[in-house]
């Protein structure tokens, strides 16, 4: 019975920590860059795009395809950084609770 109560307490702690982490991920921002800094995408760790910066040298009609490719690359870079930030936060939470690595998280 004590083990069950301990597990319930641990589950409640995990739920509380997860809620706090979700709030923190919404405010944590990363920036993906491509083209040597010509294009940057800023997004939250919850994958919400917050801003895009484009160097004026790319704003030429005949450069549209290059710009499109750079935007896709910068977004991918930002997404990878956001996913890494999310994994780091998850590991910090599960480690503090003494849960095994990868405990129920993808």
Swiss-Prot record:
The keyword Ribosomal protein does not apply. It comes from the Bacteria. It is found in: Cytoplasm, Nucleoid. GO terms for molecular function: DNA binding. Keywords: Cytoplasm, DNA-binding. InterPro entries: YbaB-like_sf, YbaB/EbfC. Gene3D superfamilies: Nucleoid-associated protein YbaB-like domain. The keyword DNA-binding applies. GO terms for cellular component: bacterial nucleoid; cytosol. Its main location: cytoplasm. Homodimer. Belongs to the YbaB/EbfC family. Binds to DNA and alters its conformation. May be involved in regulation of gene expression, nucleoid organization and DNA protection. This is Nucleoid-associated protein BBta_7345. It comes from Bradyrhizobium sp. (strain BTAi1 / ATCC BAA-1182).
